[in-house]
Amino acid sequence: MGHQNHTFSSDFILLGLFSSSPTSVVFFLVLFVIFIMSVTENTLMILLIRSDSRLHTPMYFLLSHLSLMDILHVSNIVPKMVTNFLSGSRTISFAGCGFQVFLSLTLLGGECLLLAAMSCDRYVAICHPLRYPILMKEYASALMAGGSWLIGVFNSTVHTAYALQFPFCGSRAIDHFFCEVPAMLKLSCADTTRYERGVCVSAVIFLLIPFSLISASYGQIILTVLQMKSSEARKKSFSTCSFHMIVVTMYYGPFIFTYMRPKSYHTPGQDKFLAIFYTILTPTLNPFIYSFRNKDVLAVMKNMLKSNFLHKKMNRKIPECVFCLFLC
């Protein structure tokens, strides 16, 4: 019992990405700017979708949930990195580490399923446009988004509970910038082989199957696009599909490489580098790739900026008019 209490009460140490060198300071500032950009972009995306009825479609409904996941994802990791870097302390409590594991697995799993749902939405919209209003009704998109969250939470709860029950009786130093399961398993003095097999099974369900579904959907979309008579429409569709596949590959590729390798094949440098892609870079790129290049989103953004500008202008003129009335 004493050993078990020691396991649950001791803090972990996050070795992180940064040292005290000038290069690390620059790298830290770059990542912090990326974090601010990610939160700002995704928050703006949610506000735009919620505020204008033109964006109340299944595609943008799913995109709003993707933006919410991305905000939570970067906010789960980067603030702790910033705090540790500025304070010089690298500790994280057992409960804090458990929460990071739970939230990151929830969001990573949920986003994998949500990206697959979004590819299905695009497949139906482009390949079966006449059936789109029937197949993609409001409840269908709500079911896709809700299912992604719920399945992500369930998977995360199981893995978090299982991973944290291992005894950590050696070093408490996690050679990573956040509490990630593969990095934590290296600290366990118990045999984690069976659990690693479970991680591989989950990786097949949450990574390989959705990625295969996305690839198949975009493959069918490309075949449909090739049959279009308009060269401009073909060019636009190919451009959109290629950007989407780049982001999907940037997200799934490092994620698959991290979670489908045995513990013995993991190196701290590789794991940290790969994790930057699916925890920080992809959430920043998603709004640009999926939304800000879209004419509808740009039109709504322009209208919002115009209305805010006119509102400020009117607020300035009202006091002037009142003053003139008093003078008269």
UniProtKB/Swiss-Prot annotation:
Gene3D superfamilies: Rhodopsin 7-helix transmembrane proteins. The chain crosses the membrane at residues 26-49, 58-79, 101-120, 140-158, 196-219, 237-259, 273-292. CDD domains: 7tmA_OR2T-like. One of its GO terms (molecular function) is olfactory receptor activity. SUPFAM superfamilies: Family A G protein-coupled receptor-like. The keyword Cytoplasm does not apply. It comes from the Eukaryota. Disulfide bonds join 97-189. One of its GO terms (biological process) is detection of chemical stimulus involved in sensory perception of smell. It is a multi-pass membrane protein. Keywords: Cell membrane, Disulfide bond, G-protein coupled receptor, Glycoprotein, Membrane, Olfaction, Receptor, Sensory transduction, Transducer, Transmembrane, Transmembrane helix. GO terms for cellular component: plasma membrane. Residues 50-57, 121-139, 220-236, 293-328 are cytoplasmic. Its main location: membrane. This is Olfactory receptor 2AJ1. The lineage of its organism: Eukaryota, Metazoa, Chordata, Craniata, Vertebrata. It holds the Pfam family 7tm_4. Odorant receptor. The gene is OR2AJ1.
